[in-house]
Amino acid sequence: MTSTHMDKTGDGAGRKGFVGLVIGAVGVVYGDIGTSPLYALREALRPFAADGVHEAEVIGLISLMVWTLTIIVTFKYVLFLLRADNDGEGGTLSLLALLMKKMGRNVPVLFFAGLIGAALFIGDAMITPALSVMSALEGLKLITPAFAEYVPLASAAIMIVLFAVQSRGTAAVSKLFGPITVLWFLAMAAGGVIHIGDDWRILAALNPLTALSFLAHAGSVGLIVLGAVFLTVTGAEALYADLGHFGRRPIQMAWFVLVFPALLLNYLGQGALVLAHPEAATNPFFLMYPDWALLPVVILATMATIIASQAVITGAFSLARSAVHLGFLPRLRIKFTSETNTGQIYVPSVNLLLLVGVLMLISSFGDSESLATAYGISVTGTMVISTMLAFQFLRAVWGYSLVVAAVLLLPLFIIEVLFLAANLLKIHDGGWVPVALALAIMIMMWTWTRGQAYLKRLRANNEIPLDSFIRSIERKSDHSPVTVPGTAVFLTSVPDRTPNVLLHNLKHNHVLHEQNVILTVWTEDEPYVPDSRRIKISQLSPRFVRLDITFGFMDDPDVTRALALCRESGFKFEIMKTSFYLGRRNLVRTPNTGLPGWQERIFVVLEGFAIDPSDYFNLPSNRVVELGEQIAI
């Protein structure tokens, strides 16, 4: 995946670079939505299969699909949300960070909306690979029915290999993602063009009144099929999430020039095929292609679904990194798999979580038809959340009035809530799976955030004010600690309080360095912070300095590199003569404290997953001194 921090439009690299970004966006941004034709119409026709499909049902469903793509993807994402960026970055957490910056962090509705949206995305990242790959491999059943029983095993094998190679990075093969996916969209468009002429009545689906008429006459079945119709736009959130990787204009160009026309042609072709041959409703996508082309199309479909899965996995890694930097998750181990591309990352714990989840889904559901019933809830939930956040964006950032913002987004919100209601009807058929996954992840993030806030309050109340400590320690007396040469850096999250690790060092070692740095690392509610704003140095006394280092939530928090910038500000020290003092906290559960018992247990478990600050902040391991402390929670 090409993953560089682009300007807000993405057209800063010249014509050749722009074309490259467009092709790259096709592979990464549109991989997921490009695999929806494999199963969307098949699932939408399922409620009508018993009585046989009729003309009005086929045309009505295709019309719903066409206009769902038009309203939700084209209008909401391509034309509107791609402009609602946070310094060029998109996605639920990026939008949440921007709103927290404008409105403050203490807005519970915004906070929980962001957590729910992020949690739903992780659930989607488990379902998408399982459903997409199984749907592609099931095309082989048309070549030989004997392959049917091997679909789950083959799907699991592909997933194991895909997740196993994540640690090596995907920079080398990602150059092929765009061209392969372009070929996939062209193949879909060709299949549609070949069959539209099977029954020209399908063109009536281009009239939005056809969709409305179908819903008006479908009764309760109409609400049921909306859940399947929504499968056409699964993956649309990737348009917004990958905004920072490719820029707005390449994503828009890819949609209007290739992706949208190919999807429209394919869905219209599937609809015409079913009108002319109702028996094709069992698998309209693969039945569009002649026998000689079936195997190549299945192979191409499998490659496209693997690429779509890779895009979702990469998105989950990026979301996890943002969640860590924003304080929603503990410090996770994040490996950079490219020396030149900071977007190429690997998060081992998230990778393992996704792999286990995907394999459980494949073994539990067994085929794409069963798993499709579980799909949709996480995606619709994420879209509803993004619309709610977009409403606040219009008000807080663009300054729109309540009435104007409501007029623009209320119709869209109502449509998405209807889709969510339709998908919630599938709770008992497996729809509970993404809900349970999202709930578990949201509880983890909420617990971690609440626990961290409690510990910060605890430290602020119990620790000695830093200015009082410095005044006391700088007074010359017979009890003054021994001064030793060199620099000591003490990490703390509460800069106006004396770090416990500093007090422990004085208590046990009875020494104070010539130069003592109270270091606090901050994460801004913006994706990237320039080096000009990276550091702030405040001289507190002859021997004490306060140093604030600021990163964006998409930056690599490399403290060692940031310290090198201090020399440019006249603050000189040698890294190999500097000792970094870190507090290793040992949480002890006690009754009647700040967290309920169940949250205490979860918080302690999450604390165990956090990596050492020395690793997270890239501190030289041979210069780090850790002192333990017990904290009652």
Swiss-Prot record:
From the record, give the transmembrane residue ranges: 18-38, 61-81, 107-127, 145-165, 176-196, 211-231, 255-275, 293-313, 345-365, 371-391, 402-422, 427-447
Q: What is the protein name given in its UniProt record?
A: Probable potassium transport system protein Kup 2
Read off the InterPro entries from this record. Answer: K+_transporter, K_trans_C, K_trans_N, Kup
Task: Report whether Transmembrane helix shows up as a keyword of the record.
Answer: yes
Q: Where in the cell is it found?
A: Cell inner membrane
Signal peptide annotation: none
Q: What is the lineage of its organism?
A: Bacteria, Pseudomonadati, Pseudomonadota, Alphaproteobacteria, Hyphomicrobiales
Q: Which UniProt keywords apply?
A: Cell inner membrane, Cell membrane, Ion transport, Membrane, Potassium, Potassium transport, Symport, Transmembrane, Transmembrane helix, Transport
**Membrane topology annotation:** Multi-pass membrane protein
Q: According to its UniProt record, which reaction does this protein catalyse?
A: K(+)(in) + H(+)(in) = K(+)(out) + H(+)(out)
Q: What does this protein do?
A: Transport of potassium into the cell. Likely operates as a K(+):H(+) symporter.
List GO molecular-function terms, semicolon-separated: potassium ion transmembrane transporter activity; symporter activity
What main location does UniProt list? membrane
Q: Can you supply one Gene Ontology CC term for this chain's record?
A: plasma membrane
